[in-house]
């Protein structure tokens, strides 16, 4: 899927603001995911899932940094996320539906932290972008 120049600009602009807060944004998105969809906790039984835990901050940061990697390689997301796709499909065996749930939690978190920047156009671009990221992550499940 290709992105228009306006979509690329919206994604890059917001990523510029998010990139300095990856652990916080990621932890909050994961907390939101786990509160809204408790069944997603099953993959994290070895984590301390309490509010603000080191585990949530660390893993949340990794998630958001991976999204940042995709954002900075927006013209070749499959290559940028290839190793991560392998990990989720072959080792972790995460339910593919969880990526859509996490994408929603991330968008809500972005909207809360960056209300002026996360306008309708930015939301549409990020929704499309995260859908592509999710599709890439589940592409090796087949």
From Swiss-Prot:
Annotated transmembrane regions: none
Organism, scientific name: Xenopus laevis
Keyword Transport included in the entry's annotation: yes
GO terms, molecular function: haptoglobin binding; heme binding; iron ion binding; organic acid binding; oxygen binding; oxygen carrier activity; peroxidase activity
UniProt-listed CDD domains: Hb-alpha-like (cd08927)
Family: Belongs to the globin family.
Residues of the Globin domain: 2-142
Subunit-level organization: Heterotetramer of two alpha chains and two beta chains.
Entry's Gene Ontology cellular component terms: blood microparticle; haptoglobin-hemoglobin complex; hemoglobin complex
Protein name: Hemoglobin subunit alpha-5
Positions bound to heme b: 88
Record keywords: Heme, Iron, Metal-binding, Oxygen transport, Transport
Function noted in UniProt: This is a larval (tadpole) alpha-globin.
UniProt note on tissues of expression: Red blood cells.
GO BP: hydrogen peroxide catabolic process
Keyword Metal-binding: yes
Sequence positions that bind O2: 59
């Amino acid at each position: 899927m290709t992105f228009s120049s306006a979509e690329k600009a919206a994604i890059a602009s917001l990523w510029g603001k998010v990139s300095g807060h990856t652990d916080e944004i990621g932890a909050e998105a994961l907390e939101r995911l786990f509160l809204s969809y408790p069944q997603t906790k099953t993959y994290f039984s070895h984590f301390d899932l309490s509010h603000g835990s080191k585990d949530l901050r660390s893993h949340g940061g990794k998630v958001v940094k991976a999204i940042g990697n995709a954002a900075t390689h927006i013209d070749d997301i499959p290559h940028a996320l290839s190793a991560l796709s392998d990990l989720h499909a072959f080792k972790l065996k995460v339910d593919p539906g969880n990526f859509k749930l996490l994408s929603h939690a991330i968008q809500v978190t972005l909207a809360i932290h960056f209300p002026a920047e996360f306008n309708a156009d930015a939301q549409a671009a990020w929704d499309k972008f995260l859908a592509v990221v999710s599709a890439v992550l589940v592409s090796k499940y087949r």
